[in-house]
Amino acid sequence: MKHFRTERVRATPKLFTYVLVGFIALLGLTCLYYGSSFAPGSRKSDEFDGSNNRVRTGIGSLRNRDIVLAVSRFEVPKSVPICDSRHSELIPCLDRNLHYQLKLKLNLSLMEHYEHHCPPSERRFNCLVPPPVGYKIPLRWPVSRDEVWKANIPHTHLAQEKSDQNWMVVNGDKINFPGGGTHFHNGADKYIVSLAQMLKFPGDKLNNGGSIRNVLDVGCGVASFGAYLLSHDIIAMSLAPNDVHQNQIQFALERGIPSTLGVLGTKRLPYPSRSFELAHCSRCRIDWLQRDGILLLELDRLLRPGGYFVYSSPEAYAHDPENRKIGNAMHDLFKRMCWKVVAKRDQSVIWGKPISNSCYLKRDPGVLPPLCPSGDDPDATWNVSMKACISPYSVRMHKERWSGLVPWPRRLTAPPPRLEEIGVTPEQFREDTETWRLRVIEYWKLLKPMVQKNSIRNVMDMSSNLGGFAAALNDKDVWVMNVMPVQSSPRMKIIYDRGLIGATHDWCEAFDTYPRTFDLIHAWNTFTETQARGCSFEDLLIEMDRILRPEGFVIIRDTTDNISYIKKYLTLLKWDKWSTETTPKGDPLSTKDEIVLIARKKLWSLPAISVS
């Protein structure tokens, strides 16, 4: 908080003295009321109501003005309100009710209404999102791959709509996932083998000896394709919007499958260039020809040299006039993009991306799509519009005619070639990897008394740096969403070059995922970085609570002052089932002032409402 010093004023008339004292008192009360606007790490004019009152009203009336805010930076509200049960699946920046209230003019044909649009500070839901009635601790991996509690996601629309496609089946108090999909009714496992056979990979293994590791599955449904890729040592970023199928990604996350909400619309996906070896579309209902092929060009940006696009859709095989017309137009576009058909069988076609810039340079002048201008950064993604141009390879990639990455799993710990682009040496990379290996060992010693087998599956690293935290968890049956804060976004490419997945994000805003997504959230210096950007600690804590599962853990590594402040929130957030803190051992990444706090969230429910 800023401190204002007043000089002693001498005045003879008593009346003037009384007026001055009264003015200072009024000024003090004003600062007291608005103090959080100036306090480091505090929310600007965000207030909480008292007691356990639920927030029942519309988005514009969620603030209770009766609370007296703290003078000290380390004071906190007496309570944090609970959101109304209607908001048990709230995703703040994908809230279509907000679009109507703010009268946003979004182009529905371009899918802008499925993109990231956050509420202004005065319209934020600063309340704890409750679980649905009857919520249970999720079934543990690997059981969860095939079944989840119906009460946790009480939506059966997909089971009815896709009953003939083996997406999901309601079975008493559970929902089962047979492994089918719109295109692979007989199971994703058989479909994956068929793709490997089409590509003539040894042993019918789609990972091709570890050369294929990262996959982007667009329009993924309930992510059964990604679920069955895991046994092939392939990790997929399964992507789908919160559309008419609404809860498909929520089901995927409940199952413990790497997945996220997103759409190919007008903005670049939050992943750097050259992140994936393979992109997949199985009847994903995307118009790939729109806007001069801009959506295919986004896939082109994301694919590595020689990467594959698996397209299983009627346009690839149907012989009716309409589908043939679309298929021919796509073939023409791919040809101009220098892609070639690698394999075609039954209802699937696989296209291959060139391994260098040679074909681009041989095209006739004026051929569309053009190459992107030299000033375009293909790794810039946060709130950056897609571009209808081809991102050429770097000089190094063009010369070497490949990504330069070693096969998985060696690539997890081998220094990737693109380190030089962010000014990190191989020695620094190895040191970072070893540091995080030792840190995770210490974390697990602290967690061991509370962690049961397979009780942690979905993990988020809020500030992933070079991916060392996720790499150190590779021997555990978990997957990690590596989040790269916008101020460090150039490092995101290293995450993908290690065979990991993640997304760029601004922690001054809500993350685009469902409530109760993660079993463990790791925050290293995240609060210090948030404070430096002038954003709210309280907003960040409430957002962490929204995406943390009941009985999930947070590991917060930050300064002593920040940890002291956060500890005062543990009871308010219901993170007081268990907690511990320690002063960590010094290491190359440590600061002199550093504390590790681990806390566990309670399983709680809304109190019953008495009807008079």
UniProtKB/Swiss-Prot annotation:
GO cellular component: endosome; Golgi apparatus; Golgi cis cisterna; Golgi membrane; plant-type cell wall; plant-type vacuole; trans-Golgi network
Glycosylation sites: 107, 383, 562
Membrane topology: Single-pass type II membrane protein
Enzyme class name: transferase
Its EC number(s): 2.1.1.-
Organism listed in the record: Arabidopsis thaliana
TM region positions: 15-35
Keywords: Glycoprotein, Golgi apparatus, Membrane, Methyltransferase, Signal-anchor, Transferase, Transmembrane, Transmembrane helix
Name of the molecule in the record: Probable methyltransferase PMT9
PANTHER family: METHYLTRANSFERASE PMT9-RELATED, SAM-DEPENDENT METHYLTRANSFERASE
GO molecular function: methyltransferase activity
SUPFAM superfamilies: S-adenosyl-L-methionine-dependent methyltransferases
Lumenal topological domain: 36-612
InterPro entries, per database record: Put_SAM_MeTrfase (IPR004159), SAM-dependent_MTases_sf (IPR029063)
Cytoplasmic topological segments: 1-14
